[in-house]
Curated annotation (Swiss-Prot):
UniProt catalytic activity: Endonucleolytic cleavage to 5'-phosphomonoester
This protein's name: Ribonuclease HII
Free-text cofactor note: Manganese or magnesium. Binds 1 divalent metal ion per monomer in the absence of substrate. May bind a second metal ion after substrate binding.
Superkingdom, natural source: Bacteria
InterPro entries cross-referenced by the UniProt entry: RNase_HII (IPR022898), RNase_HII/HIII (IPR001352), RNase_HII/HIII_dom (IPR024567), RNaseH-like_sf (IPR012337), RNaseH_sf (IPR036397)
Residues that, per the record, bind a divalent metal cation: 5-6, 101
Organism the protein comes from: Synechocystis sp. (strain ATCC 27184 / PCC 6803 / Kazusa)
Compartments reported by the entry: Cytoplasm
RNase H type-2 domain location: 1-190
GO biological process, one term: mismatch repair
Cofactor(s) of this protein: Mn(2+); Mg(2+)
Role according to the record: Endonuclease that specifically degrades the RNA of RNA-DNA hybrids.
Length: 190
């Protein structure tokens, strides 16, 4: 069985990233013992530790993303689904079942699926995927922060904090900002 989740859906900057994990049934209790839970409920340090440990407990995993041009072209919801589909397709063995975080199943994946609203809080498989996706995306955004100073990306990871919005108003959007997400911030400085 596999779980898949995405991160970065609400960010102003950077791609939406997804991870899929294929976990043997006998390893599920081990994930719980490790402290796997929704990535948003973990400190950055604990997330990183779990992301390093998870490959030893899962059969395999895949990480993928949808970039800003794709988000602009198809919308964030469809880009999130695309990133999750790509992550599942990167698994070397196709699972019998996929638990998908959210309200949608993956339209281009022909296998048994279940959409689980709030799945990152309800399923250890989805939680494990959320951890891998979050750490991968946070690492990417931290690296990109050096190329784009002035937006406080290393701290906000691309989300719309006050400092990030201030940077957008002061410097404008970079090519990795999501124009549809940033337009109102830039046009309406209040």
């Amino acid at each position: 069985m596999a779980g898949v989740d995405e991160v970065g859906r609400g960010a102003l900057f950077g791609p939406v990233v997804a991870a899929a994990v294929l976990v043997p049934i006998e390893a599920i209790n081990q994930l719980q013992a490790l402290g796997v839970k929704d990535s948003k409920q973990l400190s950055p340090q604990h997330r990183s530790q779990l992301a390093q440990a998870l490959p030893d407990y899962v059969h395999s995993y895949g990480i993928s993303f949808a970039d800003v041009p794709t988000i602009n072209r198809v919308n964030i919801r469809q880009a999130s689904l695309l990133a999750m589909e790509r992550a599942v397709q990167k698994l070397p063995v196709m699972p019998a079942w996929v638990l998908v975080d959210g309200r949608d199943t993956l339209p281009h994946i022909a296998m048994a699926q279940m959409a689980v609203t709030g799945g990152d809080r309800k399923s250890l498989l989805i939680s494990a995927a959320s951890i891998l996706a979050k750490v991968w995306r946070d690492t990417l955004i931290t690296r990109l922060a050096e190329r784009f100073p002035g937006y406080d990306l290393a701290s906000n990871k691309g989300y719309g904090t006050a400092k990030h919005r201030q940077g957008l108003r002061q410097y404008g959007a970079t090519p990795l900002h999501r124009p549809l997400f940033c337009r109102k911030i830039i046009e309406n400085p209040d």
